[in-house]
Amino acid sequence: MDKIFVEEAVAELHTLQDMLRWTVSRFNAAGLFYGHGTDNAWDEAVQLVLPTLYLPIDVPAHVRESRLTSTERLRIVERVVRRINERIPTAYLTNKAWFCGLEFFVDERVLVPRSPIAELIETQFEPWLTEEPTRIMDLCTGSGCIAIACAHAFPNAEVDAIDISTDALMVAEQNVQDHGMEQQVFPIRSDLLRDIPKDQYNFIVSNPPYVDEEDMNSLPEEFEHEPELGLAAGTDGLKLVRRILANAPDYLMDNGFLICEVGNSMVHMMEQYPDIPFTWIEFAEGGHGVFMLTKQQLLDCADEFALYRD
């Protein structure tokens, strides 16, 4: 960003509303990609500016007329410059992200939370969940946001939060502590299900790496700051999903089910496995590429994935 813009902003903008407006203008001019928790310049500006000032993102309208100190303005401008010049997702600049209305710590060890699975948690997995769950598995937990949101939604359930990345699990553990969930959410290191004892869960929810090779080669710059381990999944994006489908029934109660996100790789799923009765979930709030299979359906198609059993 031109130095003159920076100097003008610090010198001439005075209120919180001034900074929000200026930030939106700069984001629009820069042609940023939005997809890490927001989908427009205004929401992106709110999620950058307010946490930078240690304010909640839902401050009352009259607070936006508050005057800022020059130090506060400079801190905001510095982050705006980094967001534009380095294409760093806002959540990594503020170390804050929101999922299911809950705040989480994030940094470049984990993906920024953005899964449409949030909508399923908020509706308590209706109509598939027919009883109060006692055991839930979040497979490929990353920051722990899905596991923790499930724990909030189902306070009587124990939630195992599984990931292969020790870096990600450190972030998940911090979030578990921040939410006071140490007695309910349990981060566990495992290569998918390989190192997990065969226990019975009401359901497994998974947002694994699923980006195929073609998409990996064309992702916007913002994604370069996220851990590749959490994104890439081979030529067709299904490298890990096949293993999940092969092994998940061993961990489900008889009336259990699997919820799994595959994003754009749903195209490959439908092409390669046309006879599997995936329930592709429609989201009122946007999103796609999430399927549901019951334990019985997984058992019925076990031969399709026998080669991928652990």
From Swiss-Prot:
An MF annotation (GO) of this entry: nucleic acid binding
Catalytic reaction(s) noted: L-glutaminyl-[ribosomal protein uL3] + S-adenosyl-L-methionine = N(5)-methyl-L-glutaminyl-[ribosomal protein uL3] + S-adenosyl-L-homocysteine + H(+)
InterPro entries tied to this protein: DNA_methylase_N6_adenine_CS, HemK-like, Ribosome_uL3_MTase, SAM-dependent_MTases_sf, Small_mtfrase_dom
Top-rank EC class of the record's enzyme: transferase
A Pfam family hit: MTS
Keywords: Methyltransferase, S-adenosyl-L-methionine, Transferase
EC number: 2.1.1.298
GO terms, biological process: methylation
Cellular-component GO terms for this entry: cytosol
Similarity comment: Belongs to the protein N5-glutamine methyltransferase family. PrmB subfamily.
Stated role: Methylates large ribosomal subunit protein uL3 on a specific glutamine residue.
Protein name: Ribosomal protein uL3 glutamine methyltransferase
